[in-house]
C-alpha cells in the first residue's frame, strides 16, 4: 500500500481528476475505487491510513502564484546580504506585518453532548482592531494599533518608532504591499541614510515571515474570549500583545519553524 502513502503525501486529489484539494475519507475511497477497483468502507480507510502513519491535520495553504526563482533569490542572496549588512553596521533586523482581529473570528473547540453541536452565544456585533507588529530574531517585538487602513504615512510612523526604540540602524523586511515601498517610505529612507533599510519578501510568501506567528498566536488566544464591545476587545488585544511581547522565548520560537528557520540567529 505504499502507493497510497505516496499519493496522499506527495500529491493532491486534483491530480486524480477530483475538484477538491483536500484528502478526505470520501475522496480517498473514491480514488481507491477509481484507480485500483478497491472498495472499502470509510472505517476501513481510516484504519488503513492510521496503519500508514497518516493522521487528519489542518493544512498550510501556499499560493500557487509563488515564484520559486524569486523565493530562492531571497533565501540564497537577498536575506544573506541583509544579514551581512546587519553584522557590518550593527543594525537590528525586524520582520513586519499587519493584521485585523475581528470579533466574529472564533477559534478553538469546546466539550458538549455527543451528536449535538454546542452553541456559544455572543453579541452578534461585528467590530475589529487593526494592528501592526514587528519581531526580531533575538526576541524583540513591537506593535501598534491604528484606525482605518494602513498606508505609507502610517507605515512610516511605525518605522520611526522602531528606529527610535532600537537606538541603532534597522533593517525592516515586509511583504509586497504597495505602501511598503511607496513614496512616503522612499522619502523617509532618504532622510535617514544608513539608518533605515526596507526590504521586501517575495510575493505570495507569508510563510517566510516570522511575524505571521504573532497573529496566529494572538488570534488563538482571543478567539476563546467573550468580547462584548470594541472597548473590551481593544483591552483584550493590548493585554494579549503585551503578553507575547514580554515572552522573549516565544518570539524567538517564531523563527524556528520550517519556513522561518532561515532567519534565526546563527
Language model: regions and residue ranges:
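Short functional hotspots at interaction and active-site rims
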Residues: 1-266
Amino acid at each position: 500500500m505504499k502507493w497510497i502513502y505516496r499519493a496522499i503525501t506527495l500529491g493532491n486529489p486534483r491530480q486524480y481528476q477530483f475538484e477538491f484539494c483536500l484528502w478526505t475519507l470520501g475522496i480517498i475511497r473514491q480514488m481507491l475505487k477509481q484507480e485500483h477497483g478497491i472498495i472499502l468502507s470509510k472505517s476501513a480507510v481510516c484504519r488503513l491510513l492510521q496503519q500508514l502513519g497518516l493522521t487528519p491535520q489542518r493544512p498550510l495553504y501556499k499560493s500557487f502564484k509563488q515564484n520559486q526563482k524569486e523565493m530562492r533569490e531571497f533565501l540564497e542572496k537577498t536575506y544573506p546580504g541583509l544579514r551581512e549588512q546587519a553584522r557590518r553596521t550593527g543594525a537590528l533586523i525586524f520582520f513586519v506585518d499587519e493584521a485585523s482581529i475581528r470579533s466574529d473570528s472564533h477559534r478553538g473547540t469546546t466539550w458538549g453532548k455527543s451528536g449535538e453541536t454546542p452553541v456559544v452565544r455572543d453579541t452578534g456585533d461585528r467590530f475589529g482592531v487593526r494592528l501592526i507588529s514587528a519581531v526580531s530574531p533575538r526576541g524583540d517585538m513591537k506593535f501598534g494599533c491604528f484606525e482605518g487602513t494602513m498606508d505609507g504615512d502610517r507605515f512610516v510612523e511605525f518605522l520611526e518608532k522602531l528606529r527610535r526604540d532600537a537606538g541603532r540602524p534597522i533593517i525592516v523586511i515586509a511583504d509586497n504591499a504597495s505602501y511598503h515601498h511607496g513614496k512616503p517610505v522612499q522619502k523617509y529612507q532618504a532622510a535617514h541614510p544608513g539608518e533605515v533599510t526596507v526590504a521586501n519578501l517575495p510575493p505570495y510568501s507569508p510563510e517566510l515571515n516570522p511575524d505571521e506567528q504573532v497573529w496566529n498566536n494572538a488570534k488563538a488566544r482571543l478567539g476563546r474570549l467573550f468580547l462584548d464591545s470594541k472597548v473590551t476587545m481593544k483591552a483584550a488585544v493590548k493585554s494579549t500583545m503585551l503578553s507575547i511581547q514580554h515572552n522573549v522565548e516565544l518570539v524567538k520560537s517564531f523563527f524556528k519553524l520550517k519556513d522561518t528557520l532561515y532567519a534565526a540567529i546563527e
